[in-house]
A protein has these predicted regions:
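Acidic, metal/ion-coordinating pockets
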Residues: 1-105
């Protein structure tokens, strides 16, 4: 299995680069599973939004990891609580929205 794990995608330019190039990379490198850290993907480089998550999933991302900056965009709290493909840090305060880990097939 080939796994691609990309570090911090930051702001609009990082999102654009990812969305414009990921599918080609997946095909050319025969990638089976893609993990991206998206905690700084929002337009100002802080936080994450539902819209960005959906864009990432649509361009080939399988799982989005986050960090403490994920909460900088408050709208993500309800979404991350329902979306199994978006993960918050496991060692975050309890009870925090979302999941700290998951198993994917």
């Amino acid at each position: 299995m080939r796994i691609l794990f990309l570090g911090d995608v930051i702001g609009i330019s990082g999102c654009s680069k990812l969305m414009n190039n990921l599918m080609d990379e997946i095909k050319s490198k025969k990638i089976d599973f893609v993990i991206v850290n998206g905690e700084n993907a929002a337009s100002q480089g802080v936080g994450l939004t539902k819209e960005i998550c959906l864009d990432f999933f649509n361009c080939g991302v399988d799982v989005i990891t986050t960090g403490n900056h994920v909460w900088d965009q408050k709208e993500i709290m309800e979404y991350i609580d329902k979306e199994n493909r978006s993960l918050r840090p496991k060692n975050l305060f309890e009870p925090a929205p979302g999941k700290g880990f998951n198993i994917y097939n």
